[in-house]
């Protein structure tokens, strides 16, 4: 572009467009300068150097810009204007001949104008982190003095003699223990540089940020402002303490601790351009800095000023020096002005104040905290000594400050004195105050005197600023806090010489009709004195109350941001905590302040929430890494090329603008304007149409829908613009071009309204004579097919690479449709009855030319891209003829999008009430290979309110679009009130603070600090051999990323960490070393709690320079005699080897890529559990027997710069070997055990390219380089060795069996406000009263169905309330009746199609014992068992709630429905959820001894388990008399053999045939037990199964299962109660887990558990044992298939061996628990399972770590529309494979296969283990995955996986193209409505019964 052309474009463009044009020029020139393709994506606000444009590249950039602009730019231009934004501003000024900005003050300043304090920040002793924290400390009278820090390596000893050399008289003062911690990444400071930065500088950076935010100013908004910096510092010894310069730190050490750089660093980091001064006047530094800042402001040198000071002591020399001078108090406390004052206390702290001229603060609306009325600074001069204070000088500085303020002494109420607590200094200061402020005061109004130093000690350079903050807070609270430690006033002062009194108690500080005033003094040890006078700020005007919400609360945006994902999560957590603390301000004010005063950083999120509770819940989820609904989250990239796109028809829906019209004035006014412009051409009201008012025409008329859509689209664009989002281009599809032209300024509103109204009216002539069809195929293929119909069918629109619309004659279209279907091309009709964009339009051409004549197009203010031509268009050509062509010609939308992409537009915002163009844009962008393309939809169908719009704005914002959030608060404004800017929590300034290491001030005494995360220190050995001992500690607290490395559920420190430590030790000893050999001897196990201490011993060199090494560990809390565990031995050799050069092409030619989808779930199945920190493997290729890979260090692994190679990244490179080992290798869990020839060439890599070459089944070599091909690491040989879970569990001490009990744990509701009860149905005799709108009561479901038949609305929730069992009722009879009722009700609910989307909640009272001492109702407990099983068959559709208060049942259900748990109890209003927890077990025989002469009655004792238990009673417990009651009797040979075996053991065994549930039989058996051998115990093992899906269950089938288990238990309890003997009942885990298909069995066992619990509650002995699975197959488990066994194993419950089961039987009796659940646990499976594979009850048993790891093999596919969108975005040739993978994954999960590839795609379901239950489970899973309601006949209709996947494809993508734009046609129904599901006349029971017989055998 030539110079005059640039100038012309700039002269006519708006300011934002000018800036954008010049940024594009700079980005293109930068790309040329760096020899890179395309414009360089430079961030306008970041320095060129930080973005790679430095050195020669900066010079080339200047040359390119000079050539492009014709400007003679100086060689220093990139340094003078160091960011792209600044340089663009400079170029704009030069090109438009604008004068340079002012360099000095703006106008005359008032020489004595007061200075406002508008912001404050501090960090002080006592863990004070804010001004509020300081106020709490002084108001509470807290003493913040504590002991010396232990981590600074201070070896100085305490000695009471002040003359004892080298010692200190005290080891107490006020410290900032975490002073070294720093969020370096937040300030874009590298780890290497951060190590060198003095902690004082770090604290100033963080505290300045907080002070600016405290002023309600976005810190980033001050970049380039004339803000001054005035900070006080007095120490600079930190840099000298860094004896070893860490890697990456050379060149920073000097400036890192120079005091002068502290102010410069602040200015540089924040972009301040006012004066920057560092002040060192010792203890008065910060007050002098404040005085200088005020002067600079008054002179106009700056507009804002940062003033303050900081002190952190790197060495203890100050204590030694002042001990010699007798200036320190022995106890470290300043006793200011007290008779027993004994010296000062050297403390630490930082205080920062933000100052502004008072007039400016008021003009800018900044809150004024206090006013600086006057200040003065002077010097002692030639006083009594260099360091001695001088009273007259102090009097002079006070009088100068008073004169400067224009005040008398009596007008100042209080002074926070220097008050250091010295015997000399305090009396001198007190006399000076008496001689000044003590004179001329009214009676009864003394000067009140105190000192902050009495609380926190002397914070030295920060003391004055801290005192100011204290007094400002005291003014604001109206209280003068007391000074501590004053026993009585010092006698060295004549207190009668003036009216001054000490603040020995806190005092109210009334204003008395005038502002409160106070002064602060600071005196430097060198004689520089400072005094500042503060005045209370004028009260802020009272604001009107927030307007009351008129109905539903309006949503608000809550934006947060951070540097990095961890920083963002930390910010979300802080904000959630702040809101949870309950600030009283309105939510709108809080959100407004957050949106307008906080910096917007790169990692962003926005929570859209209607109330505070919702905001807290979503922020909490965000902090935990979850992204729920109405939460946008992304990492921003620059997005200044943004296009507004406007669709044709198809996006409309009734009510699409109503909510926005009521909320946003901008939108409402735009609609009104459109309505006025349309009125002359229509006979209907736009507003009434949009609101759907009675009498208004509907949207099915083309002459209504097109003008209405036009108005909505234009108004949406106006609304987006009000949010500060301006388009750099516009494009419209068909009639959408009319709206685009209006928004671009190319048509007046009147002309645009005329075009859309008259053209749509003309279209009605064509109705009934045409049609349109969407086709999913490339344009060329479609055109070839259409050739046979000539002009009868035309291509109407090309929407994407494989998405077209054709139009024409109805008959020809029908033939074309059939032809496409015959070719296998998906095509479908669009419901319109005319053919726009076809020859039919010619019939209305003349009409249009006539009616649209007079249109006056004009030049656009925004570039207009025509979809008629597919190119940018001069909009003066948008005449009448253009709008006819727009209707007649093919819509070239695909071409237009490609041109927009080519021109650099990466963001597309769709201005429509429902997204129509977005899918096509995404498809085109993907095919075009465009990166970072963002598409945002404004609204969605039936989501047309502020929540949806704000979510759309949030999506744009988080991805990098600049947004002004002010319009978001329009619904929260009233004429009298706008949202206020509030002061938010000061803790939310920075993200994650970590400790840059190793500042040697924090190393252990006597050791050299090692800058390594694993090896903290080293000490040379004194044996003369040249050896070194390295030490370090490991724990999850210090190395949290190790929690993500678990093998078989045991935390194992990866071998790569040991190698890394060995390499670093070698480098420390020899400068550069190769690890010649390392053999791992034992795994290094990391405990969940506590610390492991490691030692790495490196011997001296031998004759060849080699050194032996040994690595050992033991727990840190181990006793002195506890041995160390040796983990590795090896050899270090000198030198690092020579890396192989010439890496060659990448990936290597011929390499075949391996799909890594789900790879970490696959590894988890082998026992290798890698959490996020270790999930670094990104791509993998196979080349013959070699593997090539790319790996990247995840953010969660922490810093990389201090490692040679981060162990997590090193380990990730080895994951390839586990995933794709050499051919023939067995699939075992292998870990590295030997290394040889390991050399490191480059330190700190975060990305690797590596090649693994297998040299055997268990050995390999590795070479790794960085992405530029530079060598990083090589491994000569790595040996792998299989490891077993048992071995690791032995090492870690974890168990494989467990005794569990059911606990009820309190859980906070996810939505504390509870759900809306509107429309709920309350069914049954136990239902609480319900009145509309909170639901309606129904006698039963039949009554509800009758209302539905009459047209009533379908309820969202049905509550089925089961009545409580009446007192005195037989519990089994009650249970049977309740179960029959519940079964019938659930079956009715499931069979009613109209209730398919309704949730069923079964409500009981007292069914579960949820609190200690409670006794459950066995009848209702049985109902819980049945419903638990039903939940497994109808996942996420049925809930269980138990309450203790019928009157609060509705509240209980409301709380539980949103609790996120399928089962819940509500007790005293608290929500409780069930979890299984471990019970302490005892070894050996447990419980009371079995009486040798007593009789044991056993039911079910002849089954497999029964015989096992009976034999155990005889052989282990010595039982000698047994009666076995069996329904089958003892006639079989097998039973006779068993009895004979027992007889041989000396037992007397009687087998009785009979039914234990028959009371007559049972009474007869009991009566037959002889008195000399009375009944001693009852063991109830009997049971029966009758499995089947719930729909096929009947009351009779239930009864068959209930009788032998539940009814028999009731009779046994009833008839043995008087005997008071133990009842040992065998129940099943199914009673609480509720497996699908076992409703009756689950109910029976739940009844038994509750019955025994009630029995125990009445004082009778007994225990119910709810067994998991036994390995020995019994009558209850013998029918289990292999599939059943796999599925059970997937839950983490493994079969018990006989020995384990019998041991648990004994232990269960000894626990004292009434109900226990003995089972075997496969901890690996338990922790590996996906959430839907592990029942919620068992999730509490999973190991704590790795909490974030990948789960077991499931089908981790996106659900619903996400899957459909993913399918649409997948190339046509890959879609079948994608869906088949989803289907096979879910089938594998249902059948319990670890690998989905085990599912053959064409094998019939009947051959792979499907029965009716598994058919139902697969239907449920696929229904959830697709978001569609699938028929129960799914498996029958589609008999193998391949057929099923084909069916799902047609369901998800009936037309795989994006939702077609019917350019001027009628609206198309939603895609979901297009799906025609198969209808079947059979009942569900008949279908399932058929599947059982056909597929289940």
UniProtKB/Swiss-Prot annotation:
Pfam families: Acyl_transf_1, KAsynt_C_assoc, ketoacyl-synt, Ketoacyl-synt_C, KR, PKS_DH_N, PP-binding, PS-DH
Lineage: Bacteria, Bacillati, Actinomycetota, Actinomycetes, Kitasatosporales
Name of the protein this chain belongs to: Spectinabilin polyketide synthase system protein NorA
Superkingdom of origin: Bacteria
Pathway listed: Antibiotic biosynthesis; Polyketide biosynthesis
Catalytic reactions of this protein: 4-nitrobenzoyl-CoA + 6 (S)-methylmalonyl-CoA + malonyl-CoA + 6 NADPH + 12 H(+) = demethyldeoxyspectinabilin + 7 CO2 + 6 NADP(+) + 8 CoA + 5 H2O
Domain Ketoreductase (KR), first and last residues per copy: 1494-1671
Stretches the record annotates as C-terminal hotdog fold: 1151-1289
Its biological purpose: Component of a type I modular polyketide synthase (PKS) that generates the backbone of the antibiotic spectinabilin (also known as neoaureothin), a nitroaryl-substituted polyketide metabolite. This PKS system accepts the unusual starter unit 4-nitrobenzoyl-CoA and extends it by 6 molecules of (S)-methylmalonyl-CoA and a single molecule of malonyl-CoA. The first module, NorA, is used twice in an iterative fashion.
Cofactor(s) in the UniProt record: pantetheine 4'-phosphate
Residues modified to O-(pantetheine 4'-phosphoryl)serine: 1812
GO function term, MF aspect, one: phosphopantetheine binding
Gene3D superfamilies: 3.30.70.3290, 3.40.47.10, ACP-like, Malonyl-Coenzyme A Acyl Carrier Protein, domain 2, NAD(P)-binding Rossmann-like Domain, Polyketide synthase dehydratase
Enzyme class: transferase
Keyword Disulfide bond attached: no
Annotated spans, Disordered: 538-563, 1113-1152, 1854-1873
EC number: 2.3.1.290
SMART domains: PKS_AT (SM00827), PKS_DH (SM00826), PKS_KR (SM00822), PKS_KS (SM00825), PKS_PP (SM00823), PKS_PP_betabranch (SM01294)
Active-site residue list: 283, 418, 458, 1045, 1211
Quaternary assembly: The spectinabilin polyketide synthase complex is composed of 4 proteins, NorA, NorA', NorB and NorC. The complex comprises 6 modules with a total of 28 catalytic domains catalyzing 7 chain elongations. NorA comprises one module, NorA' two modules, NorB one module and NorC two modules.
